[in-house]
Every structure is written in C-alpha cells, then in structure tokens.
Amino acid sequence: MTPLIFVTGGVVSSLGKGIAAASLASILEARGLKVTMVKLDPYINVDPGTMSPFQHGEVYVTDDGAETDLDLGHYERFVRTRLSRKNSVTTGRIYQNVICKERRGDYLGATVQVIPHITDEIRRCIDEATASFDVALVEIGGTVGDIESLPFLEAIRQVRIERGAERTMFMHLTLVPYIAAAGELKTKPTQHSVKELRSIGIQPDVLLCRSEQVIPDSERRKIALFTNVSERAVIGCPDIDVLYGMPLELRRQGLDEIVIDQFKLSGTTSLADLSEWEDVVDAIKHPLDEVTIAVVGKYVDYRDAYKSVGEALKHGGLRQRTKVNLKWVEAQDLEGSDMAALKDIDGILVPGGFGDRGFEGKVLASRYAREQRVPYFGICYGMQAAVVDYARHVAGLEGANSTENDRQSSHPVIALITEWRTTTGEVERRDEKSDLGGTMRLGLQEQRLKAGTLARELYGRDVVGERHRHRYEFNNRYRTQLEDAGLVIAAKSMDDTLVEMIELPREMHPWFLACQAHPEFLSTPRDGHPLFIGFVKASRARKAGGKLLREVCV
C-alpha cells in the first residue's frame, strides 16, 4: 500500500496547506521517490467548473479535462507528476457516486449512511488516485472544525487504523500569530486546533506552524509539550520572500527526514538534490532586468482568479532573469476609450473569461496593442477579443462579435463549438441549451503549427499539446476573409476543424500572438513555457527600444 501523508489545516483558512504540501512533495521527489498529490474539497459542487471566480478563484484544468481546484496548479508547479481528475475529489462527487450506486442497487437495499458508505467512497477515491506511487500527499480542504470536512476526517482516521503509523502520517498546519502589542508569539490557537483534531480521533505526527517570524526553540518546545508532538516534528513555516523557496526551508528543518524515518524508506531514497530550486530562487532574488506587463481581465479584484497566468508570467521572466511586474487592469475601465492604464507598460496580456461584461474593454486592449505595436498575448477570451478587433477594424466587418455576447451579430466571427472530439477521441455535441457544467472543450488537445510563424519558432516543434477550457471558437466561415485581410492562422486542431492560434505578420507587428488554449496550465518555475518566455522577451525588447541589452537565461 502507498504510504499516505494527510495534510489538514486549523485556526484559519488560507494558511498555505497546498504550498506546504507541494513543497514537501518536491523534496521527496528530489530524493528519487515517485510522488503524487490529491485534494479533497468539502464543497458540495461536483467540481468548481461553474463556480464564480470571485468566490473560488481559478479553475485549473488537467490533461484529461478535469476542472479542479487551483491547488492542483500549485501541485503541478512543484512536482513533475501530471495529475488527473482522480486527484481532485469533492463532497459533491462523492455523494454523486454513492447515490448512483444506490440507484443501481449496489448496496442491496441497505440504508445508505455517511458511515460507512460515504467514508468508504472517500477511501476508495484515495486508493484509486494513489495506487502505484511511492508516497502520496492528500490535502483536506477547509479548516478542522468545519462541519463539511467531518466525513473526510473520519475517513482518514479509518485509514490510519487500517494501515498503521508506518503507512500513514498526519500533518497539521496551524497559525502561531504574533501579537504586536504584547511583542510575542501566541501558541494557544495551535493548542486548541490540535485539541479539536484529537477530539475527532486524529493525533498529528507533524505540526507545520505558520507565523510572521521564526518561532524560537522555547516556543517550539511548548507547542510540542501541549500537543503531544515530538519537538523535532514541530516545523516552523515563517513568511518568506520567495514562494518557491519553501522546499529549501522545509528541507533545512529536516521535514523530509521525518517522513522517511516514519515510513522506513531510508534504504530506497537518495539525498535530496534541490539545486533546481536553488537556481529558481537565485533568479528571482537577483534579476538582471525587469518589465511591466498589464493584465487586462474581468476578475482582477480577486487575483486568485488568474493565479496560473500570474505565475506563468513570472516563470517566463525568471527563465531570463527578468523581474515581471504585473499591473492589473479592469477591462471595463477601458470601455470609455481611456487607455491611460496602458501607458508606459511593456506588454499586454488579455486572459480568459466568460460573458459580455468587460469584453469590449478586452477588444480595446487588443486594438491598442495592435496600433501602438505593444507586445500582445491573448489567451482564450483574449484570442477571441483579438479576432473581433481585427475583424472590425482591419477586415472591415462592422458589427463583428462573438455569439456569446451578441447572438444577432451581423458577423459572428466567434461562435459556439457544436461538435468536437474529447481527449479520449469521443465526439461531443453541444447547443445553446446544454448544461454549463462539464460541457466545454476541455483538456489536452494537440494542434499543428504553421511553418514560418512566430508560434512555430517559439515552440520549436510542428505539433504541440495544450490544455483547453472553452465553448466558443473562431468561426470557420471567416477564415479566408480574415486571412485575406492579413491575419495569420498560426495553428489548427489536428483534424483542421478548429483555429487554435492567430498572430500578426512580423512586418506588421513585432510580437502579437493569441491562442485559444490555456498555456499557463503547463508552465512551471523550473521550465517556464515557450509562449510566456517569448512574450516576456518581446516586452524586454520593447523596453530596450527594440534591441535587448543583454541575453540572459537560467
């Protein structure tokens, strides 16, 4: 059986369970172990696909088309393992599975209850997602004490009884607040959080203590005494300047050794080689250049809605030792044609979104970038905005729009996809009356790049795969007309039915590229992504007056 590390949180939410868990996973991976991660989310939605970005933040998409929590993005940025829908489990999905089994008669007339039926289904999902790995980390969303989390906590308590301490570990993340008026750290919230956890039947093996500053040894001893946790296993997690430095911090305190010792894996692992993370941290702390990128979006008041976009831009910068400053611009604010927010910036990125609110602002951002020769990178809705702009103002198609926003448009250059193939090769069909949840073109899709294009140059390959999440697409009726007007179709789906990327000729614009996919989902701090690296490089060139002062890379 795969050894399991269960990660819970206490005191308050948003302490960084996902980052802490992913950082530990990266250390274990660096020791030669095959690692995976699972997120258990207590909400009753089947998945976050239809949840508001203002409430939930980004919807992260996996290769197999699962719409998941943004924590899976953290996981994939820290470890090499590519995750799937098995790695994202919600209360809604658990109940959906159990009810389907009950309707089929699988329970043979039994009264279906939380224990054992719901907890058994949770355990089954954990087993399915973690089989064949050396170690798995399972994060339980929410905070200990939340009523929604109780079935998950009961399930992992049962797993501990079944597998024992040599195959399970409980890791609890708590808050140790600093009270400025008293000038001291307070351990009482941590003590109460562990007390709450123990009342459920779970005794933590490791405590990760979040704090604004380093926790003194005297406070660590106090926490260990009152929580029945070894002092060695009370790990401090102080605020750090660089997020990607967390693996180095946890390794310094020996967290991986605690895991190796408890699971008795010392004979199967090597010392952790964290040189890649050291290089990442060094590149972030010591940039040789910097640029300012405007992100023109609909949900900029809640930055988690664009979490992967922001991280991918930073990755693109650190791959060339460039600090990327992000300027968040509300798309609606541009609709009065006041482009002041886009002055003195080095590049414009327009990310994905849904609905007509702010769309005209995105179109105006595309037009501004095109006319002012500012590097432009459009993603998903950002590509659609660029197509609408080009159709209206270059191709002369007055009234051009997306049918998502105007079903009566005289020139629907963007329209609903009614038929496409899924990642498994099955044909999907949709219309305007279809359900919203899980009905988009989702997951990793291959596309063929056109020779001689900027896209082909950046990728260095003829065929690439990118993750998608959209239900509207370039209308093929306008392909020829827009190409005749100068628009370059840089990539198409493998069956030649869908336009995947567009760009402007380089004699018309130094760097104008847009894609229907979401390349941010495949960007990592250690590797970056070709499109983001190229975009940041173009922004550097604009800032330098068209010629880079220095070529740098890590």
Swiss-Prot record:
Q: Where does UTP bind?
A: S13, K186, T187, K188, P189, T190, Q191, K222
What are the binding positions for CTP in this chain? S13, D146, I147, E148, K186, T187, K188, P189, T190, Q191, K222
> By what means is the activity of this protein regulated?
Allosterically activated by GTP, when glutamine is the substrate; GTP has no effect on the reaction when ammonia is the substrate. The allosteric effector GTP functions by stabilizing the protein conformation that binds the tetrahedral intermediate(s) formed during glutamine hydrolysis. Inhibited by the product CTP, via allosteric rather than competitive inhibition.
- Please name the Gene3D superfamilies in this protein's record: 3.40.50.880, P-loop containing nucleotide triphosphate hydrolases (3.40.50.300)
Question: What extra comment accompanies this record?
Answer: CTPSs have evolved a hybrid strategy for distinguishing between UTP and CTP. The overlapping regions of the product feedback inhibitory and substrate sites recognize a common feature in both compounds, the triphosphate moiety. To differentiate isosteric substrate and product pyrimidine rings, an additional pocket far from the expected kinase/ligase catalytic site, specifically recognizes the cytosine and ribose portions of the product inhibitor.
Instruction: Report which residue ranges the record marks as coiled coil.
Output: none
- Species name for this entry? Xylella fastidiosa (strain M12)
For this chain, the family text in UniProt reads: Belongs to the CTP synthase family.
Where do the annotations place ATP binding? S14, L15, G16, K17, G18, I19, D71
Question: GO cellular component terms?
Answer: cytosol
Listed PROSITE patterns: GATASE_TYPE_1 (PS51273)
Oligomeric state and interaction partners are given as: Homotetramer.
Give the annotated active site: C380 (nucleophile), H518, E520
UniProt key word Metal-binding: yes
Identification of the protein by name: CTP synthase
**EC number from the UniProt entry:** 6.3.4.2
Question: What's its catalytic activity?
Answer: UTP + L-glutamine + ATP + H2O = CTP + L-glutamate + ADP + phosphate + 2 H(+); L-glutamine + H2O = L-glutamate + NH4(+); UTP + NH4(+) + ATP = CTP + ADP + phosphate + 2 H(+)
Q: Which residues form the Glutamine amidotransferase type-1 domain?
A: 292-545
